[in-house]
């Protein structure tokens, strides 16, 4: 909220208010408007106010028609003065000048109190200025003025006036003020309503994200104009992150002719009036751009990888089966061969040249010779282990040997 304090000199405040009529409409070629001087729609008894009717008319033809509470009055001048206002002057005022349409109504209220909160108007459109004045009876000075909205203070002023240069929806509420004269006074509440000019924009894309490279993408900054103003033109700006894509264009669309991976990011838009009195930003919209993809359909890729997986599983099972069969066959062939060779190996003995017996065990793979415990060992080729030396001959044989 932008607040500006003023002193007793009201020229700046008056200049601020005259460009916007009381009814909240900009001067146009079809509708008349009413302005007030001084610019307050609430005044004390015995105070003066002048209403001015402005609108299109032919040169030299400024004939004006005034309406009070719906009844035409016999006044044909562009100005309507109320000297020393009374309660009977309270009511609804309209005017029509030249070829214009009747103006929007202005509600004038006459009060009798010690302290009065004056407003430039009670109903206005966001972006328009609002002037407030804490006014003492018979223009008595008021010090240490505090302004309140909905019961909460929002401005302390050393003088009695304050202005909100650009109103928004949060400025709607019940306003009052308090100040010190001979005593501490508090004004009655005044209802101020700020109407929305256009809705908060929403950024939408023509295609769903993510989308492939090369896609044509149109971004649309959508908003609804709630109040029609003659000559009103909205301006649209587009951004990605902090980068400006397009600034203050009258078109609500932005085109990405051929999307690339670099175009991915968070996009948002901004809508503003021509004088930037109302400016609103949309939420962010994330755009994701996919890299190059095969032209084959998705179901083809699923079927392909499923087939590869099945073939791999079958090959693994077959390999394990074949390997197991080979091992079983080899085992069945080796067992009989080893058994037969073992029997033959145990059925013969061999006598060495030195008279020592040795037994040879032969198998299909190797033989191991065995030597008698007390005699020398001899290796015979690949024979099996040597057997112990046979027992000596009987006693009779030994006797014959000793005799000889």
Swiss-Prot record:
Residues 25-297 are extracellular. Disruption phenotype: According to PubMed:11911823, mice display altered endocytosis of monomeric IgG and impaired antibody-dependent killing of cells by macrophage. Antigen presentation is also affected and those mice develop only reduced inflammatory responses. An increased in IgG responses is also detected associated with an increased number of antibody-forming cells. PubMed:11911824, also reported that a variety of IgG2a-immune complex-dependent immune functions like protection against bacterial infection were impaired. It is found in: Cell membrane. It is a single-pass type I membrane protein. SMART domains: IG, IGc2. Residues 394-404 have a biased composition (Polar residues). Macrophage-specific. This is High affinity immunoglobulin gamma Fc receptor I. It comes from Mus musculus (Mouse).
């Amino acid at each position: 909220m932008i607040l500006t304090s003023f002193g007793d000199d009201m020229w700046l405040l008056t200049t601020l208010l005259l460009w916007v009529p009381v009814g909240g409409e900009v001067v146009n070629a079809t509708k008349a408007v009413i302005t007030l001087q001084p610019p307050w729609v609430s005044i004390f008894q015995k105070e003066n106010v002048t209403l001015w009717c402005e609108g299109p008319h032919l040169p030299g033809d400024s004939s004006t028609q005034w309406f009070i509470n719906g009844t035409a009055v016999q006044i044909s001048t562009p100005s309507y003065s109320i000297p020393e206002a009374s309660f009977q002057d309270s009511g609804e005022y309209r005017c029509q000048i030249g070829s214009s349409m009747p103006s929007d109504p202005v509600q004038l209220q006459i009060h009798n109190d010690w302290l009065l909160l004056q407003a430039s108007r009670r109903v206005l459109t966001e972006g328009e200025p609002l002037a407030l004045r804490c006014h003492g009876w018979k223009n008595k000075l008021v010090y240490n003025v505090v302004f309140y909205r909905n019961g909460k203070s929002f401005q302390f002023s050393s003088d009695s006036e304050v202005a909100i240069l650009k109103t928004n929806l949060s400025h709607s509420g019940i306003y009052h003020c308090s100040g010190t004269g001979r005593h501490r006074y508090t004004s009655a509440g005044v209802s101020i309503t700020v109407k929305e000019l256009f809705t908060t924009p929403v950024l939408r894309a023509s295609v769903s994200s993510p989308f492939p490279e090369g896609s044509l993408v149109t971004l649309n900054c959508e908003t609804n104009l709630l109040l029609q103003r003659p000559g009103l033109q909205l301006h649209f700006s587009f951004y990605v992150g902090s980068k400006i894509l397009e600034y203050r264009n009258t078109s609500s669309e932005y085109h990405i002719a051929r999307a690339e991976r670099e175009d991915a990011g968070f996009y948002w838009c901004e809508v503003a009036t021509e004088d930037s009195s109302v400016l609103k930003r949309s939420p962010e919209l994330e755009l994701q751009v996919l890299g190059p993809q095969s032209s084959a359909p998705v179901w083809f890729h699923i079927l392909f990888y499923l087939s590869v997986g099945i073939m791999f599983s079958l090959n693994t099972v077959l390999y394990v089966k074949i390997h197991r069969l080979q091992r079983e066959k080899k085992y069945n062939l080796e067992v009989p061969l080893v058994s037969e060779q073992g029997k033959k190996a145990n059925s013969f003995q061999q006598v060495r040249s030195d008279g020592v017996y040795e037994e040879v065990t032969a198998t299909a793979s190797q033989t191991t010779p065995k030597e008698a415990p007390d005699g020398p060992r001899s290796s015979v080729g690949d024979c099996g282990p040597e057997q112990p030396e046979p027992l000596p001959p009987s006693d009779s044989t030994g006797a014959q040997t000793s005799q000889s």
